[in-house]
Structure formats: C-alpha cells, structure tokens
C-alpha cells in the first residue's frame, strides 16, 4: 500500500501532504479498526480516497453517488460507526472534501467495514 501511495505521489497524482495523510489513514484502518486495507478492495478504496482528496483540492467535481444507493447503505446498523470513522479520517487533511466525493468515500469505507465483519 505504501509503495502505491508513494508512486502516486512521485507521479504527481497526489501531493506529498496527502500521501503522508493517507499513510496515517492506512495505519488507523489497519491497526486500530482491523479493516482489510491491504486487500484488492482496500487498495482501491485508499487509491480512490487519495484521488478524491486531490480532486477536492483542485476544485474538480465528479457526479455524486446515487442517492438511492446511499440511502440503502444508511439503513445499515453499522452506518453511524462508518460515518464517524470517515469524519475522524478526514481530520488528517487540511482541506474540505467536495460533497460530491462524500458518498463514494463512505461507500468504500462501508465496503471495507463489511468485508472485515465477514472475515470474523
């Protein structure tokens, strides 16, 4: 995971501060939350988060996640914990995430949360 983030940084896809913050995110998710960040799904989620942070910094907008899908995810008993974790992770970064990115970030984090619970 660290290699991938460093490659994104070296290629200019993400800034150094975002790379450093993402290393912190990976550490928190792996050691404190026991989420499978080193899986294919985890790699995709971390890459997307880093890219979303850069898009937000650059003022680039994407289409938001479908509201119906987000509403369906929000019905989960785990949703509040996922939202709280999401907010904690974003505190690592000195930027405001574009609201269009929020749904995707939450969905990816939810997916990791559910994958971890399936493994138990």
Curated annotation (Swiss-Prot):
Coiled coil: none
Record domain PRD: where: 13-119
Record's signal peptide: none
Gene Ontology annotations of biological process type: regulation of DNA-templated transcription
Record-given protein name: Uncharacterized protein YhfY
Origin species: Escherichia coli (strain K12)
């Amino acid at each position: 995971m660290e290699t991938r983030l460093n490659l994104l940084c070296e290629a200019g896809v993400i800034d150094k501060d975002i790379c450093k913050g993402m290393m912190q995110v990976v550490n928190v998710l792996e050691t404190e939350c026991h989420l499978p960040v080193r899986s294919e799904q985890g790699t995709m989620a971390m890459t997307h988060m880093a890219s979303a942070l850069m898009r937000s910094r650059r003022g680039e907008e994407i289409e938001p996640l479908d509201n119906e899908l987000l509403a369906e995810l929000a019905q989960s008993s785990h949703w509040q914990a996922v939202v709280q974790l999401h907010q904690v992770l974003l505190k690592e970064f000195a930027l405001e995430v574009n609201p269009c990115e929020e749904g995707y970030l939450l969905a990816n984090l939810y997916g990791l949360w559910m994958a971890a619970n399936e493994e138990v």
